[in-house]
Amino acid sequence: MAPSNLPESTTPAEVPAPYGTGPAAAAQAASAAGRKPISRVRIHHLQQAKDNGEHFAMLTAYEQYTAEIFDQAGIEVLLVGDSASNNVYGNETSLPVTVDELLPLTRAVSRSAKRALIVADLPFGSYEVSPGQAVATGVRFLKEGLAHAVKIEGTAYYADTVRAMVQAGIPVMAHIGFTPQSEHSLGGYRVQGRGDDAQRLVDDAVALQDAGAFSVLMEMVPAETAAAVDAALRVPTVGIGAGKTTTGQVLVWQDMAGLRGGKMAKFVKQYADLRTTLSDAAAAYGEDVRSGQFPGPEHSF
């Protein structure tokens, strides 16, 4: 998905074609339209995308170099997800990862990305007890992790939690549909929002929006249901396995770039094969070392 050129300040009639090839293209398009290019993506830019029928891209990031690369490629939002549990720490699910494990990753991404909006997941067990617990955890991610916003999973039950966090100055993205932190209660990785359950998702999304969430992310939701949710909301939506009507799309970067290997989820589009590239590079390095070809004279002092 090409990065969008979100406007700094514009009306719908003034919006040019939103697709470029990163900040340079975005700056050129903004200049041609007589607008100031975006130096830092903010929440209101995502809202403008929703209002103007544009789209934005979101990827996970967990450390310096991917944050820099994705930021320079024009990705508007970087998510320091609790998926780090699976993709960094080697766990089978997102449940074991802790606040203290996610904070250093969030800090690294926030320090490295100069333009993207940084959203951090609140991990399982860090916000469910009470709105007060959620506020305290959210403050840590903004203060210690340098994030710009946080994401929490849940239904309309968490509307009071979202409201308390927003009132405390913590921007919140809500996550509905399949929520990985609830995989055991949901019966595993299953599509949500089919049949009679579709209206519940719409109601959850509206309740979380009305509580102050600046965006609603939907995971593994039928395209028709996701379209109904998007139509019911004023705020931008983000999809992962939720069709194409959402304002934004998000993928785990290791899936997008082909690092994970193995069978991918249906909603993943793989844009590279980094697993093969890195494996070939490591094998070639090992062979050069064992054969005495590395280091050569050009690598020695």
From Swiss-Prot:
Question: What's its EC?
Answer: 2.1.2.11
KW Transferase (keyword) present:
yes
**Location of the region described as Disordered in the Swiss-Prot/TrEMBL record:** 1-24
InterPro entries to which the protein is assigned, alphabetical: Pantoate_hydroxy_MeTrfase (IPR003700), Pyrv/PenolPyrv_kinase-like_dom (IPR015813), Pyrv_kinase-like_dom_sf (IPR040442)
Q: In which pathway does it act?
A: Cofactor biosynthesis; (R)-pantothenate biosynthesis; (R)-pantoate from 3-methyl-2-oxobutanoate: step 1/2
Indicate whether Metal-binding appears among the record's keywords.
yes
| Domain of life per record | Bacteria
Record's Gene3D superfamilies? Phosphoenolpyruvate-binding domains (3.20.20.60)
Annotated residues that bind 3-methyl-2-oxobutanoate are located at D82, S83, D121, K151
Any idea which residues are catalytic in this one?
Answer: E219
UniProt keywords, alphabetically: Cytoplasm, Magnesium, Metal-binding, Pantothenate biosynthesis, Transferase
According to the UniProt record, one GO cellular component term is: cytoplasm
Q: How is the cofactor bound?
A: Binds 1 Mg(2+) ion per subunit.
- Name the SUPFAM superfamilies for this protein: Phosphoenolpyruvate/pyruvate domain
| Enzyme class per UniProt | transferase
GO biological process entries: pantothenate biosynthetic process
Which cofactor(s) are needed, names only?
Mg(2+)
- Compositional bias (Polar residues) spans? 1-12
As for subcellular location, the record says:
Cytoplasm
- MF (Gene Ontology): 3-methyl-2-oxobutanoate hydroxymethyltransferase activity; magnesium ion binding
Pfam families in UniProt: Pantoate_transf
Q: Which reaction does it catalyse?
A: 3-methyl-2-oxobutanoate + (6R)-5,10-methylene-5,6,7,8-tetrahydrofolate + H2O = 2-dehydropantoate + (6S)-5,6,7,8-tetrahydrofolate
| Described function | Catalyzes the reversible reaction in which hydroxymethyl group from 5,10-methylenetetrahydrofolate is transferred onto alpha-ketoisovalerate to form ketopantoate.
Quaternary structure per UniProt?
Answer: Homodecamer; pentamer of dimers.
Which named protein is this? 3-methyl-2-oxobutanoate hydroxymethyltransferase
